[in-house]
Amino acid sequence: NPDCLLPIKTGPCKGSFPRYAYDSSEDKCVEFIYGGCQANANNFETIEECEAACL
């Protein structure tokens, strides 16, 4: 899935939402804090969604 290779993007907004993204350097899904706007497609609400899409 090419979306999984996109960089992990917090975005410019000031929210604090736990999300998951695929980290290609670690070959796994990792948690990060999402600000709430301007996400890219490498942004999943659960680790299960991330793993289903990217692993």
Swiss-Prot record:
Disulfide bonds: 4-54, 13-37, 29-50
Keyword Disulfide bond (UniProt): yes
SMART domains documented for this protein: KU
Gene Ontology cellular-component annotations: extracellular space
Keyword Transmembrane: no
InterPro entries: Kunitz_BPTI, Kunitz_BPTI_sf, Prtase_inh_Kunz-CS, TFPI/VKTCI-like
Entry comment describing in which tissues the protein is expressed: Expressed exclusively in the middle silk gland.
Alphabetical keyword list: Developmental protein, Disulfide bond, Protease inhibitor, Serine protease inhibitor
GO molecular function, one term: serine-type endopeptidase inhibitor activity
Pfam families assigned: Kunitz_BPTI
Site (Reactive bond for trypsin) residue list: 14-15
Domain BPTI/Kunitz inhibitor, chain residue ranges per copy: 4-54
Organism domain of life: Eukaryota
Note: Has an isoelectric point of 4.3.
Described function: This cocoon shell-associated protein inhibits trypsin Activity by forming a low-dissociation complex with trypsin. May play an important part in regulating proteolytic activity in the silk gland or protecting silk proteins from degradation during histolysis.
Protein name: Trypsin inhibitor
